[in-house]
Swiss-Prot record:
It comes from Aspergillus oryzae (strain ATCC 42149 / RIB 40). Cu cation B binds at H290, H294, H333. GO terms for molecular function: metal ion binding; tyrosinase activity. Activated by acidifying treatment at pH 3.0. Its EC number is 1.14.18.1. Belongs to the tyrosinase family. This is Tyrosinase. Pfam families: Tyrosinase. Its cofactor is Cu(2+). Homotetramer. The N-terminus is blocked. This is a copper-containing oxidase that functions in the formation of pigments such as melanins and other polyphenolic compounds. There is a cross-link at C82-H84 (2'-(S-cysteinyl)-histidine (Cys-His)).
Amino acid sequence: MASVEPIKTFEIRQKGPVETKAERKSIRDLNEEELDKLIEAWRWIQDPARTGEDSFFYLAGLHGEPFRGAGYNNSHWWGGYCHHGNILFPTWHRAYLMAVEKALRKACPDVSLPYWDESDDETAKKGIPLIFTQKEYKGKPNPLYSYTFSERIVDRLAKFPDADYSKPQGYKTCRYPYSGLCGQDDIAIAQQHNNFLDANFNQEQITGLLNSNVTSWLNLGQFTDIEGKQVKADTRWKIRQCLLTEEYTVFSNTTSAQRWNDEQFHPLESGGKETEAKATSLAVPLESPHNDMHLAIGGVQIPGFNVDQYAGANGDMGENDTASFDPIFYFHHCFIDYLFWTWQTMHKKTDASQITILPEYPGTNSVDSQGPTPGISGNTWLTLDTPLDPFRENGDKVTSNKLLTLKDLPYTYKAPTSGTGSVFNDVPRLNYPLSPPILRVSGINRASIAGSFALAISQTDHTGKAQVKGIESVLSRWHVQGCANCQTHLSTTAFVPLFELNEDDAKRKHANNELAVHLHTRGNPGGQRVRNVTVGTMR
């Protein structure tokens, strides 16, 4: 069984002479030689005989499971090192990618970690690049398709609340529409689910289901707004909109963005006179489209919308506990880091001295969202000087401030040269006006929900049929119910733009009960109606 001891000095840069900067490209732009080297490097780190910080098992295990520290067998704490729902989300994952890229470059010194451009037209139309969905590459197992566990993981928190994320040695990571639950109370149902898929669909059809799921999330609700303009909404819209969020604290995570939007939100009172204050845009954090893509690949059931046709899908990307064991995780996060890099460039914040946080704001405390990570006490204020454990640089603890000056990083990004529609070739303009009516959904307590979940917003059309118009996803951990350290920080509030409606129509439809919100969880995939819904604007 894997050790629970932390890796105390995990260096994120190569020692010795100044290294050549890695140039991170779109994976669709790699030539055959570059792709060959990438595959060979991934095979090298996934070699079951490899141990220590160059082993994929240990690299993947830094994010979530196998848990360590207080979170090893105590659900009051988070046993993974990763940060979500706080200001360290972008920088911790930046350090994490550097650690993985360092290991890959030991296998092949000129290899770089590519990004999967989730914003381009090719992804919106066809889904995941083929290199991630083909079982073999040139006659050998493809290391980007799946990972086979070299050791077992035991979920010591399995009895609380109701899910077991233990994984046996030899387990192969899976994606939607498969289920990867292996606990003693789940494995029979998961095997029945997976056997049904294998008996009724071939590999091409299974890949088609996954790609359909991904494209549905990206393309949901492509509207003609009240000004006659085409608006690409939901995940693809969020990817662009997050770059316009100016304040780092708000941009960095969902917890801070929820509070910021709450402060700007003004209800549209039926029959009342609306405020004359200048309209402002809804703040979309970087973490929001990130969450959507995790759930798109992992699977969450939302009836009536082409997001999940098969109840019971539990792909590894769908929960923080095991997401990092799926190789696609790193290409997804490389895209998220490129968005972060682009945001820094757009807002002229390419040096650490140019970025500050809102002190003691929601999203700046260790108990926000997931709970304290190993080495950080409960109710600790987070800053840009908070150590990003377990990462080190020349023996010194890595902090956010050490990773915010772009010219000092050991890598650069190259914009995509093939395809169309990429956000990196068509960066949105700052001060872009966007002020549709906003649906505010509140009263969601994550303490009672095991795992990730989604809120689906539907609108009754002229035939009386409900049509799903928006989804807000929450990437979570299985055992959040037991997090006594973060019980008062588990309230989720969502803000969803209603692009098709003007303010009067939004008020009327809300008053006539034509706008509905349902909460879809693992335990209740059919959805539960949420009543705490308000229509308003951002002022």
